[in-house]
Amino acid sequence: MATLEQKLQELVADPIDAMGFELVGVECQRAGRFLTVRLYIDKEGGVTVDDCSDVSRQVSAIFDVEDPIADKYNLEVSSPGLDRPLFTLAHYQRFVGREIVVHLRIPMLDRRKWQGELVSVEGDLITLKVDGNLQAFAFGNIQKANLIPVFNF
C-alpha cells in the first residue's frame, strides 16, 4: 500500500516536470489535526521564490481537483536547501563523497543517528565512513537523511 507521500509524488511529479522543475521529494508532517505537505523542487541554477509560488499554485489546483488529502493541510514548496534531504538511491549516488547525517528506523549498534562521509551506494546499501570506519546501512532502514552544509569562507 502506497504512503501518502508516494501518492502525492505520483500525482504531481509529471506536472512539476512539465514546468521545468525536478520534484526532489515530498514530506508530510502532522501537527495535531493539521498536516503540512512539503514539496522540494530544484532545477539547474536553483529555484527562486517566484518558482516556488508558481509550483504552489499549480499543485494547489491539482489538489483542488483530485482531493488526495482528507484532512486540512498547509502546502509548502521550497528548494532542497543547503541541508538537502536525500529521498532516493539516485540522490545518494549523486552525493557520494559528501558528508551526510542519517536517521535510522531501527538502531544499529545502539544508535539511530549517524554522520559521516558517503562512500558508496551498492544495490540498496549505503556506506558511510564514520570516525575512520565503514558502516553500511540498508536503504529501507533509513528514515531520513540530509547533506551536511559546507560553508567556504
UniProtKB/Swiss-Prot annotation:
List locations, semicolon-separated.
Answer: Cytoplasm
A single BP term in Gene Ontology:
translation
List the signal peptide residues: none
Gene Ontology cellular-component terms for this entry are:
cytosol
Task: Name the lineage.
Answer: Bacteria, Pseudomonadati, Pseudomonadota, Gammaproteobacteria, Pasteurellales
Extract the Pfam families matched here.
DUF150_C, RimP_N
Domain of life where this protein originates: Bacteria
Query: What is stated as this protein's family in its record?
Result: Belongs to the RimP family.
Q: Which HAMAP family match?
A: RimP
Keyword list, A-Z: Cytoplasm, Ribosome biogenesis
* Role: Required for maturation of 30S ribosomal subunits.
What name does the UniProt record give this protein?
Answer: Ribosome maturation factor RimP
The protein's matches in Gene3D superfamilies, at most eight in alphabetical order, are given as: Ribosome maturation factor RimP, C-terminal domain, RimP-like superfamily, N-terminal
